[in-house]
A protein has these predicted regions:
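Short, basic interhelical loop/turn and adjoining N-cap
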Residues: 97-107
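Short, basic alpha-helical nucleic acid-contact segments in DNA-binding proteins
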Residues: 112-122
Length: 204
């Protein structure tokens, strides 16, 4: 990953990448990639409404709606959502928000009740992982995603889904360019018209 331009040394890091004279540098990123991956997985668990909320704009987005349900500010609801979705226990909420044990436990339970399709997905993925010897989950394209522990299953599923989609997109772009007559493969051509420079997070 590369720091955003506004982060410390972010601009300097990004300035390391560029193209030669007479060439043009192009870039793209994916729109709400992680939310779309989540939506894909929760749909079979009666997740139609939740999937729409994942892609909605304020004030109808998932974090705004969760904030109302949980009775906390939107920025806290967003932090809670990502923390719990990626395996945090209630003690993490206690530390993050400065809550007492009982408050943190209540918020933990309230969050999962508010996102029932995601909760059902979490449980189903956990059962699948256990049935496979606690070693892997099945990725969006059928590959094995080796996991560290049960609490990281959703993280592994969603993050791998985004990476897989980005890799497929890159392959498709190369295929389309070659169909248009561009030379892209240095192992087939003496000179090439374009090449990949870098992929990071959900940007190329």
């Amino acid at each position: 990953n590369i720091a955003r331009a506004s982060s410390i040394y972010g601009k300097e890091m990004r300035s390391l990448f560029g193209c030669g004279e007479g060439m043009v540098q192009l870039g793209f990123d994916f729109s709400s990639l992680e939310a779309r991956i989540q939506g894909h997985y929760i749909l079979p668990f009666n997740g139609d409404d939740l999937a729409e909320q994942l892609l909605a704009s304020k004030p109808n987005d998932i974090h705004s709606l969760n904030a109302k349900k949980l009775g906390i500010p939107r920025d806290q609801a967003k932090s809670v959502s990502y923390a719990l979705m990626y395996g945090a226990a209630y003690k993490k909420l206690k530390k993050m928000l400065g809550l007492a044990d009982e408050q943190a436990k209540a918020l933990f339970d309230a969050y999962w009740d508010a996102v029932e399709p995601l909760k059902n997905l979490r449980d189903a993925v956990g059962s699948s992982w256990e049935a496979r010897g606690k070693s892997f989950v099945v990725g969006v394209d059928g590959r094995k995603i080796v996991t560290r522990s049960k609490h990281s299953l959703l993280n592994a599923l969603f993050q791998s889904g985004g990476v897989i989609c980005a890799k497929y997109a890159t392959v498709f772009i190369y295929q389309l360019l070659e169909e248009q007559g561009y030379k892209c493969n240095p192992f087939k051509e003496k000179t090439i018209d374009m090449c990949g420079m870098i992929e990071y997070h959900d940007e190329c």
